[in-house]
Amino acid sequence: MKNRIPVVLLACGSFNPITNMHLRLFEVARDHLHQTGRYQVIEGIISPVNDSYGKKDLVASHHRVAMARLALQTSDWIRVDPWESEQAQWMETVKVLRHHHRELLRSSAQMDGPDPSKTPSASAALPELKLLCGADVLKTFQTPNLWKDTHIQEIVEKFGLVCVSRSGHDPERYISDSPILQQFQHNIHLAREPVLNEISATYVRKALGQGQSVKYLLPEAVITYIRDQGLYINDGSWKGKGKTG
């Protein structure tokens, strides 16, 4: 892994609730970047959206952060960061990226320290921060008034994207349809999930509301938390469903 560029992957979203598909995005993206021979993924960050995002059926951020922490108990490289969810208001994605980039700079400066014996080349390379998303997010860049062009350009030019394809999406076309994405496509990495994976948080919420099993769609610890906290449940639908959902 010598001379590879270190990378931190950041995923923003509702995580309402976090699913196994969210975790797979990180694994697929890491494999793809490693296979290029140029990058070494050193960390993954999950950033649940602020409560003021106003999305329908969005449970409180402290629950979503707690569920993400439980889901990541078995991961040695992905963590949840509550900063975005703890802000006074909803934060645009580019502002979340800026925050974590500043944190990387601060962390790197502290690690290097004022050591006069170190030459610049001897210092560890500053990790690149890249936004991790599904192809559905790439498609939303074309939605009128949803993203500012200046923000899209900053994301793809300064940071970069790692986009994991999902069935029913054509990321290459989304890029070719956007002058900004086309200009900076060298900084957009398209990874393909070889396993058909159609788990969505929307489906999970619907299944929970109808008292259906979500076992194997979510980490077991998350299912237990949802049951114990009574989240996404209508009319006591967990009754008679057993402890594992």
From Swiss-Prot:
Sorted alphabetically, which InterPro entries does this protein's record hold? Answer: Cyt_trans-like (IPR004821), Euk_NMN_adenylyltrnsfrase (IPR051182), NadD/NMNAT (IPR005248), NMNAT_euk (IPR045094), Rossmann-like_a/b/a_fold (IPR014729)
- Chief subcellular location equals mitochondrion
Reaction catalyzed: beta-nicotinamide D-ribonucleotide + ATP + H(+) = diphosphate + NAD(+); nicotinate beta-D-ribonucleotide + ATP + H(+) = deamido-NAD(+) + diphosphate
Q: Which residues cross the membrane?
A: none
* Family, as annotated: Belongs to the eukaryotic NMN adenylyltransferase family.
Biological role stated in the UniProt entry: Catalyzes the formation of NAD(+) from nicotinamide mononucleotide (NMN) and ATP. Can also use the deamidated form; nicotinic acid mononucleotide (NaMN) as substrate with the same efficiency. Can use triazofurin monophosphate (TrMP) as substrate. Can also use GTP and ITP as nucleotide donors. Also catalyzes the reverse reaction, i.e. the pyrophosphorolytic cleavage of NAD(+). For the pyrophosphorolytic activity, can use NAD(+), NADH, NaAD, nicotinic acid adenine dinucleotide phosphate (NHD), nicotinamide guanine dinucleotide (NGD) as substrates.
- Protein name as annotated: Nicotinamide/nicotinic acid mononucleotide adenylyltransferase 3
